Amino acid sequence: MKKLLCAVLLSPLLYSNAVLADDAKQLRETLTGTESLKADFKQTVTDVNKKVIQSGAGVFALAHPNQFYWHLTAPDESKIVADGKDLWIYNPFAEEVVIMDFTQAITASPIALLVHRDDATWSQYAVTKKQDCYEIKPKATDAGISAVNVCFNKGTLNKFNVLDDKGNLSQFDLSNQHSISTGDKALFKFVLPDNVDVDDQRIKTQ
């Protein structure tokens, strides 16, 4: 899951800038209608030879602006929570919590477009529409994620996948999608567990 927060590879553009701009506009308009979302997910990870190397399940949620929740419940528990300012990565098995600046951690990933609305963030990616899906590729040259595909059914996000630079493809199928309720807002507030090691990587201001 940390790979979702890494920098991403530059890939060749196959379409004109005008077409890409139109596709990005359509995706942006679709996401504007999704101010918040909560869903269950099933995850399947395949390697470069299309062999399944991991399966999992959990709960996914997002809310505008800049709030994100990811709780992998199987096979091993892990949690990622972004409250709009900080991002927390919790590994219960290792009894460790990593804290990062939200903008620094998430902006380098195409996943950022799901929770960001600002022009500066969108200008960092090339978007290509393919039927009901949008392929998002970064314009950066750092290693990490090669592309993200997000797919919609009647305007509702129903699946997405993440391709990393090693050829591993993580596919996520969503179900039970609905808007965030008042009670669900607590998902975006991370409560630090007792007796865990804390690795605070936030940039300290003088």
Swiss-Prot record:
Q: Does the keyword Ribosomal protein apply?
A: no
On whether Ribonucleoprotein is a keyword of this UniProt record, the answer is no
Predominant localisation class: periplasm
Name the InterPro entries on file: LolA/LolB/LppX (IPR029046), OM_lipoprot_carrier_LolA-like (IPR004564), OM_lipoprot_carrier_LolA_Pbac (IPR018323)
Q: Which family does it belong to?
A: Belongs to the LolA family.
Query: What role is this protein assigned?
Result: Participates in the translocation of lipoproteins from the inner membrane to the outer membrane. Only forms a complex with a lipoprotein if the residue after the N-terminal Cys is not an aspartate (The Asp acts as a targeting signal to indicate that the lipoprotein should stay in the inner membrane).
What is the protein's given name?
A: Outer-membrane lipoprotein carrier protein
Give the species this sequence originates from.
Shewanella oneidensis (strain ATCC 700550 / JCM 31522 / CIP 106686 / LMG 19005 / NCIMB 14063 / MR-1)
